[in-house]
From Swiss-Prot:
PANTHER family tied to this protein: HEAT-INDUCIBLE TRANSCRIPTION REPRESSOR HRCA
GO biological process: negative regulation of DNA-templated transcription
Pfam families per UniProt: HrcA
GO molecular function: DNA binding
Signal peptide (from-to): none
Annotated family: Belongs to the HrcA family.
Keywords: Repressor, Stress response, Transcription, Transcription regulation
Source organism of the structure: Anoxybacillus flavithermus (strain DSM 21510 / WK1)
Protein known as: Heat-inducible transcription repressor HrcA
Reported function: Negative regulator of class I heat shock genes (grpE-dnaK-dnaJ and groELS operons). Prevents heat-shock induction of these operons.
């Protein structure tokens, strides 16, 4: 249990280091208005904090910097609330006042605004295609033998497949099948389509469509969408401005992680709990992120989680500001998507 003096000193050290990037010494602390005790007491308390693992000494300065344990305690217990400026709020809300009709574009814009406001790297994980729901399906004949199947989901995701038509199938059968599919499958999650086709659609197609077997195989193949969730990255170069990554080896390690989309995708999929989550340094359990913090939030539609928004920065991150910005973006994105889905 830390004493009140130790809590005060730890908070000031973390706040100062986040702001300046410079180690904090006892002389700097003694000049703070909040500090009313002697320099000797400051040094003793700093020594105790160091022994407890909350701060550590750098090789190039007599000052101290927060350790990972210190940052963790700060985020969990000492984080001051931050009120966003009106300009920040208006900048974020401007995204959702634009006439954007595609989920992908709305997510990309959210990622860009967030990276601009934080000066860190922003990653937004869209919903997995299999979590989308079917909105419409069209089959447009190209000639007597081929057609293009167009699948549109409730999120605006569009996928096209060129398919082979059965020999001599009447155009009226193609039209009938499209009507049956849209009537029976609209609103069904893509991951449930195969079962739904077998249990509820197959017998209807058998009654109304010639070459029923061929058409059923064709449409089942078209609806087998295995694309992973889309990942949108913005502000990657912002990390170059952080003094922590002036070391080329550290920077290369971080960029390798970002470039390995599967690894980063796996990392974000782990952070899918509701609310704000903060992972600091080695808590991310990824080599190369020892000097990074990852703050995540989920966005949803009508209470159903749809995706994840994350801000990646140095452990010396402006936690209060980033959390406030991230929370606002996630909340407003969820509201916008809920209204959009309800309208449809």
């Amino acid at each position: 249990m830390l004493s009140d003096r130790q809590l005060l000193i730890l908070k000031i050290i973390v706040d100062d280091f986040i702001r300046s990037g410079q180690p904090v010494g006892s002389r700097t602390l003694s000049k703070k208005e909040q500090i009313t005790f002697s320099s000797a007491t400051i040094r003793n308390e700093m020594a105790d904090l160091e022994e407890l693992g909350f701060i550590e000494k750098t090789h190039i300065s007599s000052g101290r910097v927060p350790s990972q344990k210190g940052y963790r305690y700060y985020v969990d217990h000492l984080l001051p609330p931050v009120r966003l400026t009106q300009k920040d709020v208006q900048t974020i809300q401007s995204i959702f006042h634009e006439q954007i009709y595609e989920l992908e574009k709305l997510i990309q814009k959210s990622a860009q605004i967030l990276s601009d406001l934080t000066n860190y790297t922003t990653v937004v994980l869209g919903p997995s295609v299999k979590e989308h729901k079917l909105k419409t399906i069209q089959i447009i004949p190209l000639n007597a033998e081929t057609a293009v199947a167009i699948i549109v989901t409730d999120t605006g995701y569009v996928e096209k497949h060129v398919v082979t038509l059965p020999p001599s199938i009447p155009p009226s059968d193609v039209e009938k099948m499209v009507n049956i599919l849209n009537e029976r499958l609209t609103g069904v999650p893509l991951e449930d389509l195969t079962d739904k086709i077998q249990t509820e659609v197959a017998h209807v197609l058998r009654e109304h469509i010639q070459s029923y077997d061929h058409m059923l195989r064709m449409i089942s193949s078209s609806l087998d969408l295995n694309a992973p969730a889309q990942m949108f990255l913005s502000g990657k170069m912002n990390m170059l401005r952080q003094p922590e990554f002036s070391d080329i080896d550290k920077l290369r390690g971080l960029f390798n992680i970002i470039e390995q989309e599967k690894e980063f995708y796996r990392l974000l999929r782990k952070h899918n709990q509701q609310g704000i989550q903060v992972k600091i340094g080695t808590e991310n359990d990824v080599e190369g992120m020892e000097n990074c913090s990852l703050i995540t939030a989920t966005y949803s539609v009508g209470g159903e989680k749809l995706g994840t928004i994350a801000v990646l920065g140095p452990t010396r991150m402006e936690y209060s500001r980033v959390i406030s910005l991230l929370n606002l973006v996630a909340t407003d994105l969820s509201k916008a998507l809920t209204m959009w889905y309800q309208k449809d």
